[in-house]
Amino acid sequence: MSVKKKNTPLDRYRIYLRLEKGLSLRTLEAYMSDVEKFAAYIAEEGGDLLAVELEQLRDYLATLVDVGIHPRTQARLLSSLRSFYGFLKMDGYIESNPTELLKSPKLPMHLPDVLTLDEIDRVIDAIDLSQLEGQRNRAMIEVLYSCGLRVSELCNLKISDLYLDEEFIRVTGKGDKQRLVPISPRAIAELNYYFNDRDHIEIKPGYEDYVFISERRRKPLSRITVFHIVKELVGDAGIQKNVSPHTFRHSFATHLLEGGANLRIIQAMLGHESIATTEIYAHIDRTRLREEIFEHHPRNKHCKNNK
């Protein structure tokens, strides 16, 4: 019986990390995961992992910035790529290391905070459902995190934008550009609970189609109101981080990337698609977009584990 040899560059790099570097399994898998994310990105771009050029690396890092990936995560990903391409050069796969000319991302004095899934659950658990606005706020947080919306997109979301049976919502972003974004079953459930309460609000004429309504003003929530609601809920949850509505968008992108989602799809879901990205994904149907997000979003994994 013959033993199949592992001779791909990624296979040999894994062996190198385990045997020569002596890394723990957890650290080894972290390195491999980072490199595999980049390998998937290069493959989607039609490139060759062994013939990567400096400009491709810069585009990758620029895309990480574009989708709001935490600077520390950016720095870690680059460190992993430096290690991988250093190995490829040492082992004779390539003549020069393309990462040598790349500068590490500068870490600002104050880094944007990202919430863990546990912290997001704590924020939701801190909501008092006995209050009139309780279920609205619960649905609001779930939609922010499930869909990675900007606060302005949340405030402008309309009932006519919801395709809940298909598990999609239509989002109008900057420049009035529209995109379809998958919405999780949990967020859909919270919205349906909220709509039961919303039916009892006498909404001012002209605003009936807006999803999130202020009970007191009987009009759509403003951005400032959402900001204050989030601040209050985070304080009630005992979380000592600087959190705004945008934090949920950062967390959405970071958790998807860490979970292995396709970087270009994350970019498209956030409404940051470039002309090139739009061309690349023009042929991808809604089913793939939905499956990609649902497979890698920790909220959906969390739901599956509790079924």
Residue ranges and their predicted role:
Residues M1-K307:
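Conserved catalytic core of the tyrosine transesterase superfamily
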